[in-house]
Amino acid sequence: MKKTIDEIDLHGLTVDEAIPSVDRFLHQSYKARLRRVWVIHGRGTGVLRSAVRQYLTKHPLVRHCATANGDRGGIGATQVELAD
């Protein structure tokens, strides 16, 4: 999967490592005026995906999040719409 400025790859991170990384990424993305970003968490057991999505649903900069389209990782990634 191609890495771009609008995505963060959490492969290999624990939940405790991933959440602060996602928070920094969201703030940087918001400052860069991005409105749609992707969080790549992998398919695996779903532990990281669940923790990240739970965090995203409560984050003040997140308007909406959902499973990414197949070309952006499908169930292994989450598409995030940032607030205006």
Each PLM stretch: what is its role?
Residues 1-84:
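Long, charged, low-complexity intrinsically disordered regions
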